[in-house]
Structures are given as C-alpha cells and as structure tokens.
C-alpha cells in the first residue's frame, strides 16, 4: 500500500509540474533550434539552424492558435556529376508559421497549419571555380546571389508535436514545401525537419 501511495504521490507531483494553460492565456516564446533540411531532388540533407519568436492564444484549455516569425537557414547538398562537381545550396528565409494546436495531455500538443516564407538570401557553394554554372540557377561565381530565378516566396505545411515542462518547450515539426524553389526549370521543393527549444512567457494573469 505504501508503494502504491508513493507512486500516486509522484504522479500527482509530476502532473502538477506539467504546463497547464487556461482559456484566455496568451504567451510568447523565444526559440532556437536545429534544421535538418533538404530539397526534393537533392542527394543529401544539410544541418542548419533557426531562431525566432512565437505567440500563442488559448481559445480553450485544449485548443490554441499561434503565429510567429523565424529566421530559418535551409538548403541541401548535391553529389558530383559528369558536368558538375559537388555543391551545396544555402537558402535563408523568414518563415511565418500560423499554427493550430490541440493539447492531448497537459503540456503535450499536436499541431499543424500553414507557413508562408520569404526568401532573404540564396547562395551556392562549389568545390571548383571552373564548373560551368550556366545551367544551374544562372550562377557564374563560387558563391553568388541568385535573385533572378529563386522564388521570393515559399509556402509549406508544418506538422509537429511539442512538450512543455515548467515553461520550457521542446518542439519537433516537419515542414513540407508546396511551392517550387525556382520560378522556372526543375520543380523541386523545400523539406525541413525542425527541432527547437524555447521558453514561454505568459502575458496574461
């Protein structure tokens, strides 16, 4: 009996320490994390970072809507071919996630929504300056901005899960790109797994 009571007490303490938000709560969350990014036609993924701020409003104790702004570094790696040496594409976006979240348990939420993105920079890195770049994004130098052909906007669908404990939030989501990265030519799209750590500040009593 004592063991059962001890287990119950521990479970009670654990549950009470989980984040429980009430209807009408409004929070902001600075966050930083890792991107494992690729493009739909790429050979290899690439590790990059993201950082930003998200806000969340609880419509009920289980359902919330949130939005944010994040600087997200994305891209991919490509193996060497007969005409090109190996190269790496770097894409910087300001991503604006708009998410609906449902709390299955206190602190544990599943989420999805839509994520518009706005291109800030597009670069490519090559091992050899002598590679003919005319057929690849119109680039002619080792690292050059490609404003002519890379789409300025990106739309993706994020699907994820988050766990909150004492205001600390661990978030994992996968962003499935819908729009083409290039305005013309081959139709490849962003694919990004994001793992982040954040801290929630409650702005309402």
Regions found by a protein language model. Give the residues of each.
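Outer-membrane beta-barrel channels and translocator barrels
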Residues: 21-23, 58-60, 105, 165-168, ...
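Residues that define the transmembrane beta-barrel architecture of outer-membrane proteins
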Residues: 24-28, 45-49, 90-94, 153-157, ...
